[in-house]
Amino acid sequence: MREGKLHYGWIVIFMGLLTTIAAHGFGRMAYTIILPAMKDGLKFDYTQLGLLGTGNFIGYLTMAIIGGFLAARFGTRIVITLALILLGITLILTGLAQSFGYAFTMRFLTGMGNGAAYVPAMALGSVWFAMKRRGFATGIVSGGIGAGTLISGLLVPLILAAYGHEGWRYAWYILGGTALVIAGIVFALIRSRPDEKGLLPVGVSEKDSPPPSPAGPKVSSLQWSSVYGMPSVWYLGLVYFFYGFSYIIYMTFFAAYLVKEMGLTQAYAGGLWALVGGLSTFCGIIWGHISDRLGRSRGAALAYFVLGLSYLVYALIKTEFGFYLSAIMFGLTAWSIPTIMAAAAGDFVGPRLASAGLGFITLFFGIGQALGPALGGYLADISRSFTVPFLVAGGISFAGMVASLFLKKPQA
């Protein structure tokens, strides 16, 4: 590639950004703002709504692990494209829900599409960028979560207002259709590895580049076993678990707390959620850069500390000031841990196995996510308040902070 010419890696990273907008922004984060209207439309209680979240995360967990390995073996392009098609179709079908069983099934399948698209997308920074720029590149991809959240927070309340009682159905239809359009764009432009374009990763020169393994995309079972045989990768997964368990309680019941418990309007909740999305669009870049400078361990610990404070503020300061303070703190830190964990996975297992490594540690993240909504919904039902679930989320986040401090630096 000539000096001054845009490296194709930046185009790939932008495709990763679009992928996370659809996969996480529409497939997961939109549920938070649609949840109150969906509750009224289907007459579900909070335990059922929490279980819908759990079903989504079980699907996510299943394909995050398998999808990471499939991307390492067969290529990121085909895996992400098929996953986005599945996600788009099931989002549309969610709008047809009439029963809990059907809604649970659709949220489960949406989760599968989310996991299979999101994990390979988050590993793109490790494949296309040198280690010294890996956190920054991964942060750009994770910015799609915030952008998708912002779009959902602005768009969904308008759809709900326009279509009344059935508005939540149209919200799913529109989000699903948009995801299918994104699938087509990503298929056209994304590439799995730099060698497909005759390039080295961004930030790597020919004199610095060691002889790579053969260019073929296939990864053997022996190489896969080396990923889950590393104790340091298991510990990385444990650190990631605390994020999955804590943040999802806050995310799932964010709008329901404001609307159902605090008596605020759907528009207010949507506006505050849009603020979270807007701020979080750039938080991955910020925290990826911080982890490039401070190291993954200290970067993760600092991020967990800020996240924990945001949950406690939301639970204890029940005023508009508290709600905005919590939203700002969370928005500026929301996707910090996924960004740092994705970069760390690449640090530990290398670029070719980055998707597989991230998929493996996502097992722990997904277990936390599967437990969080059900526990949060149960605690809200028995206490008739969201205060206890948010306090629990804060305590779990602080535990993640402590665990992060013992994360070992990978050997060069």
Per-segment meaning from a language model:
Residues 29, 57-65, 150, 277-285, ...:
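Residue-level signature of mid-helix packing/kink "hotspots" within the transmembrane helices
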Residues 86, 90, 101-109, 321-329:
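Paired small-residue
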Residues 43, 75, 96-102, 130, ...:
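Helix-breaking motifs and short loop linkers at transmembrane-helix boundaries and internal kinks
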Residues 31-35, 230-282:
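Extracytoplasmic gate region of multi-pass secondary transporters
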Residues 106-144:
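Cytoplasmic helix-loop-helix junction between adjacent transmembrane helices
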Residues 274-284, 289-344:
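C-terminal transmembrane helical hairpin of 12-TM major facilitator-type secondary transporters
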Residues 140-195:
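Helix-loop-helix hairpin linking two adjacent transmembrane segments in secondary transporters
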Residues 62-101, 291, 297:
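Conserved MFS/SLC helix-loop-helix module at the cytosolic interface between two early adjacent transmembrane helices
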